[in-house]
């Protein structure tokens, strides 16, 4: 997401733009703003989930970034509704705070994350501010036949949108 560090992107872009490189983004807004080429996010269809007991209603794994208030609000909403969410926040060097969910100091590998997905009925996708493109969470919900709860309203315009499987 360029919006989180626009100056770093501009430095990189200006340094290599005359070297024949092409820049792509899965976010249409970024493509329009910066003159990039659009391409959807890709996913490896050969990945599979291990069969597991679905013990959580929703799974969120990610950094806090600019989403702290949304994350806390959604966690409270899910637990108040009697759901069993699993939220795993990975440290990004920010000050540790007391959260009502899992907090990890170390990176969670993708295969470990997929094990978490296998134990959840739905995947929670909390878009970053100014993000229009679909995240990997959207693709994972589709490929692993999981429900999707997302804050990304652009999903409603997609060809795969199904109100029975996707909640915005």
Question: Where do the protein language model's features map onto the residues?
Answer:
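Catalytic core of nucleotide-activated saccharide and alditol-phosphate transferases
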Residues: 1-79
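A generic local structural motif
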Residues: 8-12, 44-48, 108-111, 136, ...
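Short, polar loop motifs at secondary-structure junctions
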Residues: 24-32, 89-95, 151-156
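Short, mixed-charge, low-aromatic patches
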Residues: 31-33, 72, 95-97, 132-139
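Hydrophobic anchor at the start of a short beta-strand
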Residues: 36-39, 84-86, 148
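Catalytic donor nucleotide-activated moiety binding site of glycosyltransferases and closely related
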Residues: 69, 73-111, 153
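Catalytic binding pocket for nucleotide-activated donors in carbohydrate/polymer assembly enzymes
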Residues: 99-105, 113-168
């Amino acid at each position: 997401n360029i919006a989180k560090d626009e100056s770093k992107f501009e430095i990189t872009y200006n340094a290599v733009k005359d070297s024949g490189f092409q820049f792509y983004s899965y976010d249409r807004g970024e493509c329009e703003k910066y003159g990039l080429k659009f391409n959807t996010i890709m996913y490896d269809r050969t990945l599979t989930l291990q069969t597991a007991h679905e013990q959580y209603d929703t799974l969120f794994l990610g950094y806090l970034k600019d989403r702290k208030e949304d994350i806390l609000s959604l966690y409270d909403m899910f637990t108040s509704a009697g759901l069993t969410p699993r939220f795993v926040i990975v440290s990004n060097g920010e000050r540790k705070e007391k959260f009502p969910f899992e907090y990890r100091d170390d990176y969670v590998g993708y295969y470990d994350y997929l094990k978490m997905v296998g134990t959840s009925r739905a995947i929670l996708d909390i878009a970053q501010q100014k993000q229009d493109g679909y995240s990997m969470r959207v693709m994972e919900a589709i490929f692993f036949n999981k429900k999707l709860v997302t804050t990304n309203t652009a999903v409603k315009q997609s060809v795969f949108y199904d109100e029975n499987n996707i909640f915005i």
